[in-house]
Amino acid sequence: MIVFICKFLHLISLFIAGGGGIGNAVIQSIYKKEGKIPEPHLAKSFRVLAFISLIAVIVMWVTGIILAILIYGGFNLSWSFHVKLLGATLILITSLLINVHLKKCSQNQIPPNQTLMKYSASLARLGLILAIAGAIWTFV
């Protein structure tokens, strides 16, 4: 039963993290193309989505570790599994970085650094590609 619950939470977290990340990226790109700064209430929603996504990524890590131990007896699966872990690590690091940056910007009432946000998004996309490719190679 614990395996089922962990798989369920793992997949739900995947959808939540992905939805938050894509939603934020789409809305921010529209504002950027129009040369506008988001209103304060919308900027707050960016922070909330980023935080929810971070929590979802952390849940994926915890449930993934539990699943690897329960199903496979540990992390010694294959090189492709470690590529997946590298991708997941990049996603976790960028999510933490973005959340810390948005929190500081909110406290100081300044707009987010667009260069940092751009490179963080690119790093997260790379992590996503590695995580998906590694998961497909390992588990399919």
Give, region by region, the residue ranges found by the protein language model.
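Polytopic transmembrane helical bundles with strong interfacial aromatic enrichment
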Residues: 1-140
